[in-house]
From Swiss-Prot:
Organism ancestry: Bacteria, Bacillati, Bacillota, Bacilli, Lactobacillales
Alphabetical keyword list: Aminoacyl-tRNA synthetase, ATP-binding, Cytoplasm, Ligase, Nucleotide-binding, Protein biosynthesis, RNA-binding
Record GO cellular component, one term: cytosol
SMART domains listed in its UniProt record: S4 (SM00363)
Name by which UniProt lists this protein: Tyrosine--tRNA ligase
Enzyme class: ligase
Name of the gene: tyrS
Keyword Isomerase: no
Length: 418
């Protein structure tokens, strides 16, 4: 199976320019290709992972990746399928984000070894020194307004309004392709399907200005089986930065993927062979309640993004929380697992009665309700039920002298810190 056939079999090719010419280019020898990442935040997220892993697959097949971080285009803002104008960031902010994103990309692509080792580039290197007049004369003249207006990303914004800044973005992305081709012989661009218009601006510029052919592959924007945009949890992006989305949170995200999506995501997000995935799929279909596909998915992706140790910690936390054995976890583990849970700080020597504590920490709305909660067995301290109205917290309830977890009912957790 060729690399192009494998990408197709994994569902990683949404659209291409001339497919026959592209297949021929892969067959004739190593292809130099690039993927662009605009610094719109201080971290990449799961949505970026599809293109990143596609780049890694091509590198493993012998092709040479260029990872372009948009130090210049990040200052402008891509209008593609955004309902409103993006807020412009300061140069200092974008530079900081560029540095962080470069560090994240180095986890997935090999920048050290072989003739096809990855190369990191920043488009500020060429845009930073070009004058506005030169850009209009040397690049702008190759794009008609009619051509630019025909792009879906622009059409959608015409009625609500689009600034010239964002309107010109597609020319900048097109020029990236031209520069990378001239400097490094790059002939292929890979990106999300929402980037098709911007990406083909690059092939158009190559054709008109240099009389050369360029290729484009778009990877699909991943949605779940309900059509919901993938890569967000409770409305928030699942980040690749462990300080923004912990390995435990990422593990839980994959563990809770819907059954109908799990095997498909194994093809997209893991490096397991298609044969292995087929076998996992068969076993999974025999007993979906055991969630084999989700467990393998969580193992593979968390290990890939954060390492084996982080994966094992996420599993340990999950198992102990499920068993209600909170005292088997460290305060650090619990803080990771309960990130975002309401927290109440009390003095280490404050000996509050359980009823007073529940009211003061706003766990129960009133003393009457607090007493009922305790008597009805709805209150748990570190996983153990408390039904004694005279119960007072002691040092044994303080995990690592740092934290106590109180649960009200089945799911409402609260954290006490000292």
């Amino acid at each position: 199976m060729t690399i192009f056939e494998e990408l197709k079999a994994r569902g990683l090719i949404f659209q291409t320019t001339d497919e026959e010419a592209l297949v021929k280019a892969f067959e004739e020898g190593p292809v130099s290709f690039y993927t662009g990442y605009d610094p719109t935040a201080d971290s990449l997220h799961l949505g970026h992972l599809v293109a990143i892993l596609t780049s890694r697959r091509l590198q493993l097949a012998g092709h040479k990746p260029y990872a372009l971080v948009g130090g210049a285009t990040g200052l402008i803002g891509d209008p593609s399928f955004n309902d409103a104008e993006r807020s412009l960031q300061t140069k200092e902010t974008v530079e900081g984000w560029v540095e962080k994103i470069q560090g994240q990309l180095s986890r997935f692509l090999d920048f050290e070894n072989g003739d096809n080792k990855a190369v990191m580039v920043n488009n500020y290197d060429w845009f930073g020194s070009v004058s506005f007049i030169d850009f209009l004369r040397d690049v702008g003249k190759y794009f008609t307004v009619n051509y630019m207006m025909s792009k879906e990303s622009v059409k959608k914004r015409i009625e609500t309004g689009i600034s010239y800044t964002e309107f010109a973005y597609q020319i900048m992305q097109g020029y990236d392709f031209y520069e990378l081709n001239a400097k490094y012989g790059v002939t292929l661009q890979i990106g999300g399907s929402d980037q098709w218009g911007n990406m083909t601006a690059g092939t158009e510029l190559l054709r008109r200005k240099a009389d050369k052919s360029g290729h484009v592959i778009t990877v699909p924007l991943i949605t779940d089986s309900t059509g919901k945009k993938f890569g967000k949890s409770e409305g928030n992006a699942v980040w690749l930065d462990a300080t923004k989305t912990t390995p435990y949170e990422m593990y839980q995200f994959w563990l809770n993927v819907m059954d109908d999506d799990a095997v498909r995501f194994l093809k997209i997000f893991t490096f397991l062979s298609l044969e292995e995935i087929e076998e996992i799929g068969k076993e999974f279909d025999q007993a979906r309640h055991q969630r084999l596909a989700q467990k393998v998915l969580a193992r593979e992706v968390v290990t890939l993004v954060h390492g084996k140790e982080a994966y094992e910690q996420a599993v340990h936390i999950t198992e102990q929380l499920f068993a209600g054995n909170l005292k088997a976890l460290s305060a650090r583990d619990l803080k990771v697992a309960l990130n975002g849970v309401p927290t109440y700080e009390i003095s280490a020597d404050e000996n509050l009665n359980i009823v007073e504590l529940l009211v003061n920490a706003k766990i129960s709305p009133s003393k009457r309700q607090a007493r009922e909660d305790v008597q009805n067995g709805a209150i748990y301290i570190n996983g153990e039920r408390v039904q004694d109205l005279d119960y007072t917290l002691s040092d044994t309830d303080k995990i690592d002298n740092e934290i106590t977890v109180i649960r009200r009912g089945k799911k409402k957790n609260f954290v006490l810190t000292y």
